[in-house]
Regions:
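Periplasmic/extracellular loop-to-transmembrane helix junction in inner-membrane transport proteins
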Residues: 1-37, 53-59, 148, 197-202
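Membrane-interfacial helix termini and adjacent extracytoplasmic/periplasmic loops
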Residues: 6-13, 20, 77-108, 178-181
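Interhelical loop and adjacent transmembrane-helix boundary motif
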Residues: 15-21, 176-216, 220-221
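Alpha-helical transmembrane segments of multi-pass membrane proteins
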Residues: 27-35, 69, 142, 146-158, ...
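Hydrophobic positions within alpha-helical transmembrane segments of bacterial inner-membrane proteins
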Residues: 33, 37-49, 75, 79, ...
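Transmembrane-helix boundary motif in ABC transporter permease subunits
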Residues: 35-66, 141, 148, 219-227
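C-terminal transmembrane helix and the adjacent membrane-cytosol boundary/short C-terminal tail
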Residues: 114-131, 135-138, 142-147, 205-234
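Transmembrane alpha-helices
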Residues: 118-119, 123, 141-173
Length: 234
Protein backbone atom coordinates (compact mmCIF):
# COMPACT_ATOMS: atom_id res chain seq x y z
CA UNK A 1 0.00 0.00 0.00
CA UNK A 2 2.85 2.35 0.84
CA UNK A 3 4.45 1.64 -2.53
CA UNK A 4 1.17 2.47 -4.27
CA UNK A 5 0.72 5.71 -2.34
CA UNK A 6 4.34 6.67 -3.00
CA UNK A 7 3.83 6.07 -6.72
CA UNK A 8 0.79 8.36 -6.77
CA UNK A 9 2.66 11.00 -4.76
CA UNK A 10 5.67 10.86 -7.09
CA UNK A 11 3.38 11.05 -10.12
CA UNK A 12 1.78 14.18 -8.71
CA UNK A 13 5.21 15.66 -8.07
CA UNK A 14 6.24 15.04 -11.68
CA UNK A 15 3.18 16.93 -12.90
CA UNK A 16 3.50 19.82 -10.46
CA UNK A 17 7.24 20.17 -11.13
CA UNK A 18 6.63 20.11 -14.92
CA UNK A 19 9.17 17.34 -15.46
CA UNK A 20 10.96 18.02 -18.81
CA UNK A 21 10.69 14.41 -19.97
CA UNK A 22 7.00 14.37 -19.12
CA UNK A 23 6.35 17.63 -20.95
CA UNK A 24 8.25 16.44 -24.03
CA UNK A 25 6.16 13.28 -24.24
CA UNK A 26 2.90 15.21 -23.83
CA UNK A 27 3.95 17.86 -26.37
CA UNK A 28 4.89 15.23 -28.97
CA UNK A 29 1.60 13.42 -28.40
CA UNK A 30 -0.41 16.59 -28.97
CA UNK A 31 1.69 17.59 -31.98
CA UNK A 32 1.16 14.23 -33.69
CA UNK A 33 -2.54 13.99 -32.84
CA UNK A 34 -3.43 17.59 -33.74
CA UNK A 35 -1.62 17.28 -37.08
CA UNK A 36 -3.40 14.01 -37.81
CA UNK A 37 -6.81 15.45 -36.90
CA UNK A 38 -6.28 18.50 -39.10
CA UNK A 39 -5.41 16.32 -42.10
CA UNK A 40 -8.20 13.84 -41.33
CA UNK A 41 -10.73 16.68 -41.08
CA UNK A 42 -9.59 18.06 -44.44
CA UNK A 43 -10.31 14.63 -45.93
CA UNK A 44 -13.21 13.38 -43.83
CA UNK A 45 -15.49 16.42 -43.81
CA UNK A 46 -15.73 16.76 -47.62
CA UNK A 47 -16.11 12.99 -48.01
CA UNK A 48 -18.91 12.89 -45.45
CA UNK A 49 -20.71 15.84 -47.03
CA UNK A 50 -20.36 14.41 -50.53
CA UNK A 51 -21.81 11.06 -49.48
CA UNK A 52 -24.66 12.78 -47.61
CA UNK A 53 -25.70 15.11 -50.43
CA UNK A 54 -24.61 13.26 -53.55
CA UNK A 55 -26.74 10.78 -55.42
CA UNK A 56 -24.56 8.28 -57.24
CA UNK A 57 -24.32 4.51 -57.77
CA UNK A 58 -22.86 2.71 -54.79
CA UNK A 59 -23.74 5.45 -52.32
CA UNK A 60 -25.45 3.13 -49.83
CA UNK A 61 -22.64 0.54 -49.82
CA UNK A 62 -20.16 3.39 -49.36
CA UNK A 63 -22.13 4.61 -46.36
CA UNK A 64 -22.02 1.12 -44.86
CA UNK A 65 -18.28 0.92 -45.50
CA UNK A 66 -17.68 4.30 -43.84
CA UNK A 67 -19.65 3.26 -40.78
CA UNK A 68 -17.84 -0.06 -40.65
CA UNK A 69 -14.43 1.55 -40.92
CA UNK A 70 -15.09 3.48 -37.71
CA UNK A 71 -14.15 0.28 -35.90
CA UNK A 72 -10.93 -0.51 -37.76
CA UNK A 73 -8.47 -2.42 -35.52
CA UNK A 74 -5.58 -0.02 -34.78
CA UNK A 75 -2.94 -2.75 -34.86
CA UNK A 76 -4.05 -3.78 -38.35
CA UNK A 77 -3.82 -0.17 -39.52
CA UNK A 78 -0.38 0.03 -37.95
CA UNK A 79 0.69 -3.14 -39.74
CA UNK A 80 -0.55 -1.91 -43.13
CA UNK A 81 1.15 1.47 -42.75
CA UNK A 82 4.31 -0.32 -41.59
CA UNK A 83 4.31 -2.42 -44.76
CA UNK A 84 3.81 0.69 -46.91
CA UNK A 85 6.64 2.60 -45.24
CA UNK A 86 9.13 -0.24 -44.74
CA UNK A 87 12.16 -0.45 -47.00
CA UNK A 88 10.51 -3.19 -49.03
CA UNK A 89 7.28 -1.21 -49.32
CA UNK A 90 6.22 1.24 -52.05
CA UNK A 91 6.99 4.28 -49.86
CA UNK A 92 10.15 2.90 -48.28
CA UNK A 93 12.44 5.24 -50.20
CA UNK A 94 11.11 8.22 -48.21
CA UNK A 95 12.50 6.87 -44.94
CA UNK A 96 9.38 7.72 -42.94
CA UNK A 97 9.18 4.60 -40.80
CA UNK A 98 9.84 5.16 -37.07
CA UNK A 99 9.29 8.90 -37.37
CA UNK A 100 6.50 11.18 -36.10
CA UNK A 101 5.34 11.48 -39.73
CA UNK A 102 4.64 7.74 -39.83
CA UNK A 103 2.59 8.10 -36.67
CA UNK A 104 0.60 10.94 -38.22
CA UNK A 105 -0.09 8.83 -41.32
CA UNK A 106 -1.35 5.92 -39.20
CA UNK A 107 -3.61 8.18 -37.17
CA UNK A 108 -4.98 9.87 -40.30
CA UNK A 109 -5.92 6.47 -41.75
CA UNK A 110 -7.51 5.52 -38.44
CA UNK A 111 -9.59 8.62 -37.72
CA UNK A 112 -10.56 9.84 -41.20
CA UNK A 113 -13.40 7.26 -41.41
CA UNK A 114 -14.62 8.36 -37.97
CA UNK A 115 -14.83 12.01 -38.98
CA UNK A 116 -16.28 11.13 -42.40
CA UNK A 117 -19.00 8.87 -40.98
CA UNK A 118 -20.03 11.29 -38.23
CA UNK A 119 -20.03 14.28 -40.58
CA UNK A 120 -22.06 12.32 -43.14
CA UNK A 121 -24.79 11.77 -40.56
CA UNK A 122 -24.77 15.41 -39.44
CA UNK A 123 -24.90 16.78 -42.99
CA UNK A 124 -27.53 14.21 -44.02
CA UNK A 125 -29.82 15.40 -41.23
CA UNK A 126 -29.38 19.01 -42.36
CA UNK A 127 -29.88 17.99 -46.00
CA UNK A 128 -33.30 16.53 -45.18
CA UNK A 129 -34.31 19.88 -43.68
CA UNK A 130 -32.89 22.17 -46.37
CA UNK A 131 -32.87 20.11 -49.56
CA UNK A 132 -36.00 21.71 -50.98
CA UNK A 133 -34.77 25.25 -50.33
CA UNK A 134 -31.33 24.59 -51.78
CA UNK A 135 -32.81 22.91 -54.85
CA UNK A 136 -35.17 25.84 -55.41
CA UNK A 137 -32.18 28.19 -55.32
CA UNK A 138 -30.49 26.13 -58.01
CA UNK A 139 -27.59 25.03 -55.82
CA UNK A 140 -25.40 22.37 -57.39
CA UNK A 141 -24.42 19.30 -55.37
CA UNK A 142 -20.94 20.65 -54.50
CA UNK A 143 -22.43 24.04 -53.60
CA UNK A 144 -25.11 22.43 -51.44
CA UNK A 145 -22.52 20.27 -49.67
CA UNK A 146 -20.33 23.30 -48.97
CA UNK A 147 -23.30 25.32 -47.70
CA UNK A 148 -24.32 22.57 -45.32
CA UNK A 149 -20.75 22.13 -44.08
CA UNK A 150 -20.70 25.79 -43.15
CA UNK A 151 -24.19 25.73 -41.65
CA UNK A 152 -23.47 22.67 -39.47
CA UNK A 153 -19.93 23.72 -38.52
CA UNK A 154 -20.64 23.69 -34.79
CA UNK A 155 -22.11 20.20 -34.87
CA UNK A 156 -19.26 19.07 -37.10
CA UNK A 157 -16.77 20.28 -34.53
CA UNK A 158 -17.99 17.48 -32.25
CA UNK A 159 -17.02 14.98 -34.95
CA UNK A 160 -13.55 16.51 -35.15
CA UNK A 161 -13.22 16.45 -31.36
CA UNK A 162 -14.25 12.79 -31.37
CA UNK A 163 -11.48 12.11 -33.86
CA UNK A 164 -8.99 13.99 -31.71
CA UNK A 165 -9.97 11.99 -28.64
CA UNK A 166 -9.49 8.77 -30.62
CA UNK A 167 -6.10 9.90 -31.89
CA UNK A 168 -4.76 10.97 -28.50
CA UNK A 169 -5.73 7.65 -26.92
CA UNK A 170 -4.31 5.49 -29.73
CA UNK A 171 -1.48 3.09 -28.84
CA UNK A 172 -1.33 0.06 -31.15
CA UNK A 173 -0.80 1.69 -34.54
CA UNK A 174 1.60 4.40 -33.34
CA UNK A 175 3.72 1.87 -31.48
CA UNK A 176 4.10 -0.27 -34.60
CA UNK A 177 5.00 2.52 -37.03
CA UNK A 178 6.75 4.80 -34.53
CA UNK A 179 8.82 2.24 -32.71
CA UNK A 180 8.39 4.00 -29.33
CA UNK A 181 11.86 5.57 -29.62
CA UNK A 182 12.82 7.67 -26.62
CA UNK A 183 12.82 11.37 -27.46
CA UNK A 184 11.71 10.74 -31.04
CA UNK A 185 8.43 8.83 -31.28
CA UNK A 186 7.53 8.11 -27.67
CA UNK A 187 4.05 9.48 -26.92
CA UNK A 188 1.79 9.25 -23.89
CA UNK A 189 0.08 5.95 -24.68
CA UNK A 190 3.24 4.10 -25.71
CA UNK A 191 5.12 5.52 -22.74
CA UNK A 192 2.44 4.30 -20.33
CA UNK A 193 2.69 0.79 -21.79
CA UNK A 194 6.50 0.81 -21.64
CA UNK A 195 6.89 2.35 -18.19
CA UNK A 196 4.30 -0.01 -16.71
CA UNK A 197 6.16 -3.02 -18.11
CA UNK A 198 9.40 -1.63 -16.63
CA UNK A 199 7.78 -1.05 -13.26
CA UNK A 200 8.20 2.74 -13.41
CA UNK A 201 4.71 3.43 -12.10
CA UNK A 202 5.13 7.13 -11.19
CA UNK A 203 5.81 8.23 -14.79
CA UNK A 204 3.11 5.91 -16.13
CA UNK A 205 0.60 7.28 -13.60
CA UNK A 206 1.53 10.90 -14.33
CA UNK A 207 1.03 10.36 -18.06
CA UNK A 208 -2.19 8.48 -17.32
CA UNK A 209 -3.56 11.40 -15.30
CA UNK A 210 -2.74 13.82 -18.11
CA UNK A 211 -4.19 11.54 -20.80
CA UNK A 212 -7.43 11.02 -18.89
CA UNK A 213 -7.69 14.78 -18.29
CA UNK A 214 -7.25 15.51 -21.99
CA UNK A 215 -9.88 12.95 -23.00
CA UNK A 216 -12.36 14.24 -20.39
CA UNK A 217 -11.80 17.83 -21.49
CA UNK A 218 -12.36 16.90 -25.14
CA UNK A 219 -15.59 15.05 -24.31
CA UNK A 220 -16.82 17.91 -22.14
CA UNK A 221 -15.97 20.41 -24.87
CA UNK A 222 -17.81 18.33 -27.46
CA UNK A 223 -20.87 18.20 -25.19
CA UNK A 224 -20.81 21.96 -24.59
CA UNK A 225 -20.46 22.72 -28.31
CA UNK A 226 -23.28 20.31 -29.18
CA UNK A 227 -25.63 21.77 -26.57
CA UNK A 228 -24.79 25.32 -27.63
CA UNK A 229 -25.45 24.47 -31.27
CA UNK A 230 -28.81 22.92 -30.38
CA UNK A 231 -29.87 25.98 -28.39
CA UNK A 232 -28.79 28.37 -31.12
CA UNK A 233 -30.00 26.53 -34.20
CA UNK A 234 -32.59 24.19 -32.77
Amino acid sequence: MSTMSESFATAGSLIVAADPNLLHIVALSLQVSLTAVFLAACLGLPIGAAVAVGRFPGRKPLTVILNGMMGLPPVVIGLLVYLLLSRAGPLGSFGLLFTPTAMVIAQVVLITPIIAALSRQIVADAWRDYEEQLRSLGASTPRAALTLLVDTRFSLSTAVLAGLGRAVAEVGAVMIVGGNIDGVTRVMTTSIALETSKGDLPLALALGFILISIVLILNALAHVVREWAVRRHG
